[in-house]
Every structure is written in structure tokens, then in C-alpha cells.
Amino acid sequence: MDPHKKVALETEFFTEYGEASRYQIQEVIGKGSYGVVASAIDTHSGEKVAIKKINDVFEHVSDATRILREIKLLRLLRHPDIVEIKHVMLPPSRREFRDIYVVFELMESDLHQVIKANDDLTPEHYQFFLYQLLRGLKFIHTANVFHRDLKPKNILANSDCKLKICDFGLARVSFNDAPSAIFWTDYVATRWYRAPELCGSFFSKYTPAIDIWSIGCIFAEMLTGKPLFPGKNVVHQLDIMTDLLGTPPPEAIARIRNEKARRYLGNMRRKPPVPFTHKFPHVDPLALRLLHRLLAFDPKDRPSAEEALADPYFYGLANVDREPSTQPIPKLEFEFERRKITKEDVRELIYREILEYHPQMLQEYLRGGEQTSFMYPSGVDRFKRQFAHLEENYGKGEKGSPLQRQHASLPRERVPAPKKENGSHNHDIENRSIASLVTTLESPPTSQHEGSDYRNGTSQTGYSARSLLKSASISASKCIGMKPRNKSEYGESNNDTVDALSQKVAALHT
């Protein structure tokens, strides 16, 4: 990048935020109605990060509440398979700030782009992708959180096959003792990934099984390269679901809350289920058996994330020590969901959440400090024009133009208010293409430095999502050998996954 443009970039993005000198802006990687996302270098750690500037946060209380919800959930749900907020910049004024700068770990693409750009993903990819999603979902559900909008675009991806769940703006926390909750909402899940019990219903009593259905749809999309249930409307959605799964039994239809949808299914001609071996030819029978469980029409027949992880499909990969649970989120954290809040209320709540990333000021706040304005003296001069420069130059085809993915999670585009097939149960895992698996696990990278640039924090100019996960450029050993997290709170690094799986494969040949 031209040095003069670099200086302009670094003096226009952050406006008044004095902490901005910590980050060296690299390029724009996303832009939408919410604001701008830029990649940057954290000069304290040398890491590449994504910084999302959210404009006019408090223009609509509903949008501000969604942002508050996601910032809070991502702080409380820290897990290797969930995108991480690394920092939130302290605003220049407690009472008057309008924009928020959230610093995320930088991810290269999302699962939607990976599926679209790769027609040669292997069974090992499918297995490891699904394993990560279920492992993250187990953690989310043990916190009594329902994600409610799982889809490929809401799953970030790196070229080492690491996936991370993101976009928690529509998530909800259940505080009922019963394993279900009732929510009034204007939007739940993109239709294609929406569980049948939610079709046409905005007032829904449901369970974590809604997320399990979404995971099943995502898994099927991995296997075929295209969405499984691309419904054009609610009726069409029900039609294509039943075309594959067959007409549901009366007790399953009774669980549909929308009266019209319930009546439509009750009057539908009887359809036999399509064998999954016909719909998904050449797919591992164990994978199809698990998929059939995930896509059970009746939510009570779907497994929990923990039960799915125990499926024989993950034999040799799943390990309870690497699949941590967590405690339910305390009710006090989401007390604001139970009352009507004003713009001033949500501003104070977001400010309080930002202070979680500024421990010294948090202590002062908790002691009752009343400081309401703390302008940074050099902030305006250094960053005043940066945002305008980013908007002006975004999407002009210059070097380093962004990928389609908005690489950080928070927040989504603003959403307007709406106007068992029997698998091969005794199939032995030891017979599952062992020679192919060993070859893949032992295959060396195509070059000595393959895949190292991103992990070392250096730039990858010209990187394309189309190259992501190509078999010619990445081996399953690298896929399964995820980058270890420093000081892992879960007791062992992800390299142990490789060791365990490699030992298992070796044992199969003895």
C-alpha cells in the first residue's frame, strides 16, 4: 500500500479513539449498513485482527440491544469454536458516544465461501467440520443459549480447517428450568436452515433442537455443495422437507405452532421418505445415519449436541476432555431482556460491557466513579478523516481489495420487522477407507512454508477464498492439526487431536 494512503487510512478510521494508535490499519474487508470492517495489526501482540466500526449504534434501540446482546454473549461464551472478541475500544465520552469499535480475531473466510469454492472436500473435512460445530454448540447449549441463526455464512473458516461460530445477535438465553423456552421475536433463522417447528411461527416454544436441525442442514450442504431445503416461502419449505423426509406423523405435526402450517401438513397427501443413500450416494453410511438423526422432523427425536458427539461417526476423533461444558449464564446478565429499555439505558449497558475490556476503569466504575468524559487529547488530530477515506476507496478494485465475507461477527445487517432411515448400525469404523485416511494424514504440505504466513501474522496479499481447503494445498493432517491456543483453558492443545487420531490410524494397521 502507498505510504501516503496508509497514513490517511490510519488517520480517518478511528476518529476520536485514543487507543487507536495500538492498531495499524491494513485494508477494508467488509462494509454494510452497520459500518465498516478493517483488517489491522495489533502492535502490542503482532497479531492480525479485524476491527469493526459500528456506526450510530443508538439510532434504533432494537439494533443497539442486539449489539449489546452479542457483545455480552461473546464475552461469556469463550471457546475455541466460537469467534473471540479480543478488545472493545473505550469511547471518548461515556454519555455521548455513538460509534463502537470491536476488535475480533481475524478469520479468512466463511463456510459458505468454502463450500462454494471447493468441489473436492474430503470425508475427513466433512467429519472434522461437523465435529467442531457440534463441539461449539454443546458449549453454547450448556450455557442455556440458543443461537437461532446457524447457517454457513455465520461460520467463519481458516485455511487450516478451523471453524468458528459467529453472529450471536439473534441468540437468546433461556432461564426456564424446563429444557424449552418461549420467545416473541421478529426473526428466527434464515428460512432454509429453520427447523420445521418454527415454520411460519413468530411466537414459539422450542428447545435447543432448533439449532441441531440447522447443523443438519449445514452438514447436508457440505456433502452436496448446495442447500438442502432452499424454500421460497413457508409452504414451499414444508413441501421440500416432506419430499425428502416423508409426511410426518400426527404427533410431530401437533408440535407445529403455526395453525396454517399445521393444517397444511395434516391435509398433505402421504409421502414416503426418500432413502438417504439415494439422496446422498457414495457418502459414508455412518455420516448418513447421523444426518438422519439431526434432521428428525420431530424435535424430540433429534439428539443433543453432546449425544451427537458420541455418535460412532466420530469414533477416534471425539474426546470428552476436548468438548467442555459451561455453567448456565446468570439471569442478572440479561435482566435487560425482561423490561423495556430506553436509548440511555442501552448506552449505559453497552458502556458497562466495554469496561470489561478495561479492568482499571471497570474498578473505578464499580466503586461509583462518576467520570463521564475522558477525551483523548491526540485522538481527533490523528484519526479524524480515516472513516471517510475507507468509504471512498472501498470496492474500487485497488490492491488488497476485500473478500466478500465481513470477517468479524458483530453485528449483522439490520433486519426489518416482518410484514429414521436405518443406517448401517454395525458398520465398522476400521473399514472406513483406512488407506486413504492414512495417506491424507501423512501427506506433506505442498511447500515448506505452506499455510504459515497467516499463523505468523504476515500479510497474505492476493489471498482468495477459492484456494481455501483445496486438496492440492492442504492436507487432512493440517486440517485436523489446528493452531494451539496459548494458555488453553481447556487443558490440552489442539495438536493432541492429531496425536490421538494418528495413534488410532496406526493401531488399525497393527
Curated annotation (Swiss-Prot):
List modified residues, type Phosphothreonine.
Answer: 185, 190
Alphabetical GO CC annotations of the entry are:
cytosol; mitochondrion; nucleus
Single GO MF descriptor: MAP kinase activity
UniProt modification remark: Dually phosphorylated on Thr-185 and Tyr-187, which activates the enzyme.
Q: How is its activity regulated?
A: Activated by threonine and tyrosine phosphorylation.
Q: Which residues form the active site?
A: 149 (proton acceptor)
Q: Which domain of life is it from?
A: Eukaryota
Q: Name one GO biological process term.
A: abscisic acid-activated signaling pathway
Q: Name one Pfam family in it.
A: Pkinase
Top-level enzyme category: transferase
Q: Which reaction does it catalyse?
A: L-seryl-[protein] + ATP = O-phospho-L-seryl-[protein] + ADP + H(+); L-threonyl-[protein] + ATP = O-phospho-L-threonyl-[protein] + ADP + H(+)
Q: What is its EC number?
A: 2.7.11.24
Q: Where is the composition biased (Basic and acidic residues)?
A: 410-431
Q: Where does ATP bind?
A: 29-37, 52
Keywords, A to Z? ATP-binding, Kinase, Nucleotide-binding, Phosphoprotein, Serine/threonine-protein kinase, Transferase
Start and end residues of each stretch annotated as Disordered:
393-461
Q: Where is the Protein kinase domain?
A: 23-314
Q: Kindly state the positions of the motif TXY in this protein.
A: 185-187
Q: Does the keyword Cell membrane apply?
A: no
Q: Domain annotation text?
A: The TXY motif contains the threonine and tyrosine residues whose phosphorylation activates the MAP kinases.
Q: Which family does it belong to?
A: Belongs to the protein kinase superfamily. CMGC Ser/Thr protein kinase family. MAP kinase subfamily.
What name is this protein filed under?
Mitogen-activated protein kinase 9
The encoding gene:
MPK9
